[in-house]
């Protein structure tokens, strides 16, 4: 299902002085139509920290990516920190929630999935992305489970380079870095 609205109140929009669409309404209409153009899927496996997911919701709304959350979630969708981080972009993000990893996989039939982990074998910028690919990320405190990570061939296990001795990057930062590289490779299709 595309553009599943989240349980947030709709923002109030202003009308132009002539009674036509105001600038804010035009931006809303533009985002709503863009929302139906899905290039990539972002899959968060059991995310734990609301502000990270809120930031990723905003990222997905602005890039045309679909967000898939796999339960259990470490928060409720109405969490104030999640709402604050996502600003007023929640209703423009295409999102679905899956009961478990198998349920998510059933919806991804025939699509390539890249697992992003500190234990990934290939640098994210060396992967070759195409429209329709999905990017999978694990929970903030522990990353992807070993069995899920090992179910991917090495070319689909990606990592973001860090200096020696670093443990991990922030989840929302990592998603942004990898998603923008994937989008860059398809020449920022649909970007202004």
Residue ranges and their predicted role:
Residues 1-36:
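Intrinsic disorder/low-complexity segments
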Residues 14, 27-192:
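Post-transcriptional modification and biogenesis factors for structured RNAs
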């Amino acid at each position: 299902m595309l553009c599943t609205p989240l349980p947030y109140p709709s923002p109030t929009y202003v009308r132009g002085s002539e009674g036509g669409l105001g600038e804010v309404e035009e931006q809303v209409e533009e985002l709503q139509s863009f929302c139906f153009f899905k290039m990539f899927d972002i899959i968060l496996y059991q995310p734990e920290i609301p502000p990270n997911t809120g930031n990723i919701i905003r990222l997905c709304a602005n890039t045309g990516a679909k967000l898939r959350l796999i339960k259990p979630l470490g928060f409720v969708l109405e969490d104030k920190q999640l709402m604050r981080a996502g600003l007023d972009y929640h209703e423009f993000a295409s999102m679905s929630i899956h009961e478990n990893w198998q349920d998510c996989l059933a919806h991804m039939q025939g699509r390539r999935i890249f697992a992003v982990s500190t234990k990934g074998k290939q640098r994210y910028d060396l992967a070759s992305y195409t429209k329709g690919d999905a990017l999978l990320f694990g929970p903030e405190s522990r990353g992807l489970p070993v069995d899920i990570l090992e179910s991917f061939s090495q070319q689909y296990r990606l990592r973001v380079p860090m200096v020696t001795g670093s443990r991990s990057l922030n989840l929302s930062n990592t998603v942004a870095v990898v998603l923008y590289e994937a989008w860059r490779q398809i020449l920022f299709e649909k970007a202004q």
